[in-house]
């Protein structure tokens, strides 16, 4: 059976999450869906999977049911297919933020940060500057272990361990961004959108987010100006610029990414350990 995997997020002011939670949970269970939906005052973030019929019904429900008062009418979904269900259960959770930055919640009603689409970004990188002649700086907003799997050429990488560290490292490194066009990017768009909004709010000029993140960039223009693969938070571990799963795997014990080269190590035992396990244990 082919399973449809859906991912979506949307920054929008929400105030009825407690009332919605049991109703959304019930509808998802009726459809046989599994995955996680996060609801917060700043918006929605979801990863769910099910049959084609079930996912189509969910999209119609979340976009058009009167319960949501049109707040998700423009919600855009990223879709991928798998041969099996990647999630064990269905959860609808209430959160303070849909992606944790530990800063005052952003105000979606004030508008999103400007974005640049994949084709325009590629043209900028081809030329070495944007349309106004400013040098372009690619800013990776992901965690260090994700960056190690692949990133844009010459991207700024501040080696953060979690997204909540982002505001602090930006405050400490603002000089890197002065006089340049800054393009924040992440896997699918949510972190780079929130990062761009934060930078805009603290007065950094000429900030853009990469529309749809790395995965949308791969879909539109392939791997131009990018080296390596893109880490994803599911059973596939990483996708190449053709959006195909790679031979990278995730260590069952320490959750590190194990490359094909590392899989040749005697310390790699599938389902038990990998070369990174001792370092992970000492850091715990």
Swiss-Prot record:
One example of a Gene Ontology biological process annotation: tRNA modification
Active site location: 186 (cysteine persulfide intermediate)
SMART domains referenced in this protein's UniProt entry, alphabetically: RHOD
Protein task: Catalyzes oxygen-dependent 5-hydroxyuridine (ho5U) modification at position 34 in tRNAs.
EC class name: oxidoreductase
Protein name according to UniProt: tRNA uridine(34) hydroxylase
Catalyzed reactions per annotation: uridine(34) in tRNA + AH2 + O2 = 5-hydroxyuridine(34) in tRNA + A + H2O
Rhodanese domain residues: 132-226
Classification via Gene3D superfamilies: 3.30.70.100, Rhodanese-like domain (3.40.250.10)
This enzyme's EC code(s): 1.14.-.-
Domain of life of the source: Bacteria
Family stated for the protein in its record: Belongs to the TrhO family.
Annotated source species: Burkholderia cenocepacia (strain HI2424)
GO MF assignments: oxidoreductase activity, acting on paired donors, with incorporation or reduction of molecular oxygen
Entry-linked NCBIfam families: PRK05320.1
Alphabetical UniProt keywords: Oxidoreductase, tRNA processing
């Amino acid at each position: 059976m082919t399973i449809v995997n859906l991912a979506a997020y949307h920054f929008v002011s929400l105030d009825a999450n407690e009332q919605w939670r049991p109703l959304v949970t019930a509808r998802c269970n009726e459809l046989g869906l599994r995955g996680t939906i996060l609801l917060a005052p700043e918006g929605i973030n979801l990863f769910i999977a099910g049959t084609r019929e079930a996912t189509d019904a969910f999209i119609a429900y979340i976009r058009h049911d009167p319960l949501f008062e049109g707040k998700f009418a423009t919600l855009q979904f990223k879709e991928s297919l798998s041969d099996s269900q990647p999630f064990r259960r269905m959860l609808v959770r209430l959160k303070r933020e849909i992606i944790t930055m530990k800063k005052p919640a952003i105000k979606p009603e004030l508008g999103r940060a400007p974005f640049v689409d994949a084709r325009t970004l590629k043209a900028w990188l081809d030329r070495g500057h944007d349309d106004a002649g400013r040098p372009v700086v690619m800013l990776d907003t992901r965690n260090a272990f994700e960056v190690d799997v692949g990133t844009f050429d010459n991207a700024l990488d501040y080696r953060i361990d979690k997204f909540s560290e982002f505001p602090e490292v930006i405050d400490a490194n603002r000089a890197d961004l002065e006089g340049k066009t800054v393009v924040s990017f992440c896997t699918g768009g949510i972190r780079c959108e929130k990062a761009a909004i934060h930078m805009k709010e603290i007065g950094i000029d000429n900030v853009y987010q990469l529309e749809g993140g790395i995965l949308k960039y791969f879909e539109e223009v392939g791997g131009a100006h990018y080296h390596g693969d893109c880490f994803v938070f599911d059973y596939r571990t990483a996708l190449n610029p053709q959006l195909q799963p790679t031979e990278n795997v995730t260590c069952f014990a320490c959750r590190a990414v194990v490359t094909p080269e590392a899989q040749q190590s005697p310390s790699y035992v599938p389902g038990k350990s990998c070369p990174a396990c001792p370092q992970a244990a000492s850091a715990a």
